[in-house]
A protein has these predicted regions:
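Alpha-helix-loop-beta-strand connector modules within alpha/beta enzyme cores
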Residues: 8, 55-84, 140-149
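Conserved, mostly hydrophobic/aromatic
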Residues: 29, 36, 47, 108
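Hydrophobic faces of well-ordered beta-strands that scaffold small-molecule active sites
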Residues: 6-8, 44-46, 80-86, 106-110, ...
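Glycine-rich tight-turn/loop motif centered on a GG-T
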Residues: 18-26, 52-69, 120-134, 152
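Conserved anion-binding
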Residues: 91-154
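Active-site mouth loops of central-metabolism enzymes
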Residues: 8-31, 85-93, 129-132
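N-terminal small/glycine-rich loop or linker at the start of catalytic domains
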Residues: 1-21, 112-127
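Non-catalytic positions within long, well-ordered alpha-helices that form the structural scaffold/packing
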Residues: 30, 34-38, 101, 148
Length: 154
């Protein structure tokens, strides 16, 4: 019998919890991770969200929040492979790097090139203004250096 790896992305990067049910808090993330784990997922891809009321649709690189989410998810899902998002616009990777250093995920996203970040609504209008998600080689190498220092696989 062949083996299959199932990855669950617990949230999208900019999904609004007021419009779609997405977990935000460490307890919510752990609960949803456990449901996915019980359904067969062995990898959890995670975007961290701001914890202030009404701000759960926005990303955060607060390493304390990341640590709380990672700890709660790992306790809920023993042996789960934690996959941290690293997507950040611009050259400053200090936020995602701090989270990688704090939680030491087994794997982390490594965006291997620049791309257009686009999202359409059902009416074919932009959900937000199109933006360039820049990932020059120097930025990728900086992420690889951080990942190498923590034993995180890209």
């Amino acid at each position: 019998m062949s083996k299959t790896v199932v990855t669950c992305a617990l949230t999208g990067v900019l999904t609004d919890p007021a419009q779609h049910h997405v977990p935000v808090t460490p307890d919510q993330m752990a609960r949803e991770a456990r449901a996915a784990f019980d359904a067969g997922a062995s990898v959890m891809h995670v975007h961290f969200r701001q914890q202030a009321p009404g701000k759960g649709h926005l990303p955060t690189w607060d390493s304390v929040v990341a640590s709380e989410i990672a700890q709660a998810s790992r306790e809920a899902c023993p042996g789960v492979i934690f996959n941290q998002s690293t997507g950040v616009v611009g050259p400053d990777i200090s936020g995602p790097a701090a989270c990688i250093r704090a939680i030491r995920p087994e794997i982390a996203a490594c965006n291997a090139g620049t791309l257009n970040y686009l999202k359409l609504r059902d009416d074919c209008k932009w959900a937000w203004p199109p933006m360039v998600f820049d990932n020059p080689v120097e930025k990728i190498q900086a992420f690889l250096d951080v990942m190498g220092g923590t034993g995180t696989r890209p």
